[in-house]
Amino acid sequence: RDAQESRGLGDVYKRQYCAKADFVFNLAGVNRPKVESEFMAGNFGFASTLLDTLKAHGNTCPVMLSSSIQATLIGRYGKSDYGKSKLAGEELFFEYSKTTGAPVLVYRFPNLFGKWCRPNYNSAVATFCNNIAHDLPIRVNDPSVVMHLVYIDDVVDELISALGGREHRNGDYCEVPVVHTITLGGIVELIRSFRQMPGTLSVPDLSDAFTKKLYSTYLSYLPEERFSYPLKMNVDDRGSFTEIIRTSDRGQFSVNISKPGVTKGQHWHHTKNEKFVVVSGHGLIPVSYTHLRAHETPEHL
């Protein structure tokens, strides 16, 4: 709001945007004020100004409010001034809908996380990812605390759906349908495992949705020089063998270089499937199947 006034945009905001908008996303808010009284002024106050301006122009377009789980004022949020200001904003929106008939979409977001979020500010996940990626210390007061997390890409998908009238509702409120529940200690353990993976050539289990999202988030904090790391090339007279990636459930990926006339392998596996992709040169790969007679050895060129 202050930025709008300082740039002379306040009048444009009130006269043009609020008059002509087809949908309003109210994502503005105050979460780190210098004094606690700014919570109410920034969260409730701005919401009041926004709705009054829409009402003055007779614009009853849908209005979305970004609220917080802290507005429940339950448990550790019971004395939250931030939560109280968000709850006041919610009540204002619901009353506005009753008096004008305008649709309101109130989202009580839990903890949000995602790529490039500002660390050491308002997100524990951002701080943990940044500090662990840079080998900085972190502090976890209670690893057993249960976190309810929503990934920012899922938030964006939901808001786009809301714009098209396909929001997910739960009673009076709207919600992002994908919420991940995990302890604080579990988050830290996962991020620390990401930090160690280049040394073991491992990759996370990306079949798990939360792990995939957290790993993507972690990578956005990784220093540029750590995107590459050395590989060990095992060299002998026959050529070389270099492991590239190891997985916990899908084997490994490697580069095998064989010199001309060299035979490698000459062993078998009872429970294993190997795939070869020839990227340069040519060779003969004989394959033996136990159900074939001894003299039957198919070969692949």
Language-model features, listed with the residues they occupy:
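Active-site Tyr-X1-5-Lys
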Residues: 80-105, 127-130
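Single conserved hydrophobic/aromatic residue that forms the stacking wall/gate
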Residues: 2-13, 291-294, 298-301
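A conserved pocket-lining segment of Rossmann-fold NAD(P)-dependent short-chain dehydrogenase/reductase
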Residues: 127-150, 169-172, 176
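NAD(P)H-binding glycine-rich loop region in Rossmannoid oxidoreductase-like domains
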Residues: 15-44, 55, 70-77
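NAD(P)-cofactor binding segment of oxidoreductase domains
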Residues: 34-64, 84-92
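Mid/C-terminal beta-alpha module of Rossmann-like enzyme folds, strongest
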Residues: 161-233
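Flexible, glycine-rich beta-alpha linker
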Residues: 72-73, 81, 107-125, 136
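A short glycine-rich, His/Asp/Glu-containing loop-to-beta-strand
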Residues: 225-266, 272
